[in-house]
């Protein structure tokens, strides 16, 4: 029996500004991700700070949360076997200069901060992140 895993994907303001959402979603579907929930929204600074609270004491916290509140984002709940690892591989390295050819960040990211997409890094993180943006009833079964 297959064990399906869920992960959060965020298409960040820089990629939305480049109108990359459709291309990124196509990449996800072509890599057998199932989209259980999707929405476009514009975070407030407080919402961005709540989402990234784990980084509150890091030097990049304020610039990151300012950036994440600077424009619309697309949040998705993705599902497949090994969803977290597979999505992180598709995203590419956090620093787009180190990202492999063919990855989302290599194509659309400009810098470590403006790096086009976010993805959960572990099961517990995914649970928190998904619940931050989606109520259970908002996700397809």
Swiss-Prot record:
Question: What EC number is given for this enzyme?
Answer: 2.7.4.6
Q: Which GO MF term does the entry hold, naming one?
A: metal ion binding
Q: Which organism is it from?
A: Koribacter versatilis (strain Ellin345)
Residues binding ATP: 12, 60, 88, 94, 105, 115
The name this protein goes by in its record: Nucleoside diphosphate kinase
Write down the top EC class of this protein.
transferase
Query: Which residues catalyse the reaction?
Result: 118 (pros-phosphohistidine intermediate)
Q: What is its main location?
A: cytoplasm
The UniProt entry, under Pfam families, shows: NDK (PF00334)
The cofactor(s) it depends on are: Mg(2+)
Catalysed reaction(s)? a 2'-deoxyribonucleoside 5'-diphosphate + ATP = a 2'-deoxyribonucleoside 5'-triphosphate + ADP; a ribonucleoside 5'-diphosphate + ATP = a ribonucleoside 5'-triphosphate + ADP
InterPro entries, A to Z: NDK-like_dom, NDK-like_dom_sf, Nucleoside_diP_kinase
Q: Which GO terms describe its biological process?
A: CTP biosynthetic process; GTP biosynthetic process; UTP biosynthetic process
| Chain's role | Major role in the synthesis of nucleoside triphosphates other than ATP. The ATP gamma phosphate is transferred to the NDP beta phosphate via a ping-pong mechanism, using a phosphorylated active-site intermediate.
A single Gene Ontology CC annotation of this entry is: cytoplasm
């Amino acid at each position: 029996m297959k064990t399906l895993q869920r992960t959060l994907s965020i298409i960040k303001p820089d990629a939305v500004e480049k109108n990359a959402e459709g291309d990124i979603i196509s990449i996800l579907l072509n890599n057998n991700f199932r989209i259980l929930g999707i929405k476009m929204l514009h975070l407030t600074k407080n919402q961005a700070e709540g989402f990234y609270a784990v980084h509150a004491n890091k030097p990049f916290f304020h610039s990151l949360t300012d950036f994440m509140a600077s424009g619309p984002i697309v949040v998705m709940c993705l599902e497949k076997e090994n969803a977290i690892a597979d999505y992180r591989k598709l995203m590419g390295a956090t620093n787009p200069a180190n990202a492999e050819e063919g990855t989302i960040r290599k194509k659309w990211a400009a810098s470590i901060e403006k790096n086009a997409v976010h993805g959960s890094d572990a099961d517990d993180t995914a649970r928190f992140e998904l619940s931050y943006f989606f109520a259970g009833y908002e996700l397809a079964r």
